[in-house]
Amino acid sequence: RSLEAIAAHPRLLDLDWSRVHIWWGDERWVPAESEDRNDKQADDALLSRLPLNPDKIHRMPAAGAGIDLDHAALSYADELYRVHGGTARRTPEFDILLLGVGPDGHIASLFPGHAQVYDKAEGAVPVYDSPKPPAERISLTLPTINRAKHVWFVAAGPDKATAVHLALRGLWFVDLPASGAKGTLSTRWFVDELAAAELDDDLRAEYEENA
């Protein structure tokens, strides 16, 4: 729904979209034509309406394209390194990284207690055991997410209330990956009243003051 809201913004086309690079935080390991792919949903909600440069839309590889999941993640990491440039294996400093939050506090396809949460390298990793179907996915690592200048969280509904509360309280990121995502310049939370229902008054006041 957040992408639909962006698509409906009256000043949407004021931006020079030809200069914008589009990346994915994660992707489901399904065929390119699958309705379950995040990029298909993003196309339908927003991207198909924008005058984007096709060379700057960086889709994650799809299943059934002659590449296995491990190599698909490596391929996406290589694309990140290529766009960043230089000899170091660094990923771009994203201007804005938009993240949803699961009821369990997962972000992208980094799930509580799973091995990928511990990964300290910049790049992308394969996921074989997602608690949510499909089990196989590709995800940016947490250090890659934390290269973003601005991290924007979007959470709505009562099932997100506990995750929002614990993330803002700073629960250990291994147990709640959302608490480990921080922009280098800013981190913002966009939540509805239901998702904010468990916030203490002092925490709510702190974030409203800094909004």
Task: Please report, for each region that a protein language model flagged, where it lies by residue.
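Short, conserved loop/helix-junction motifs that constitute active-site signature segments
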Residues: 12-21, 50-52, 116-117, 143-148, ...
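ATP/nucleoside-binding phosphotransfer catalytic cores, i.e., glycine-rich phosphate-binding loops
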Residues: 143, 149-211
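Class I SAM-dependent methyltransferase SAM-binding "motif I" and its flanking Rossmann-like core
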Residues: 96-143
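Ligand-binding beta-strand-loop-alpha-helix segment within the catalytic cores
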Residues: 13-95, 209-211
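A glycine-rich beta-strand to alpha-helix segment
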Residues: 1-2, 80-111
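Glycine-rich N-terminal segment of FAD-binding domains in flavoprotein oxidoreductases
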Residues: 1-12
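Short acidic/glycine-rich loop or secondary-structure boundary segments that cap or lie
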Residues: 31-33, 68, 104-111, 117-119, ...
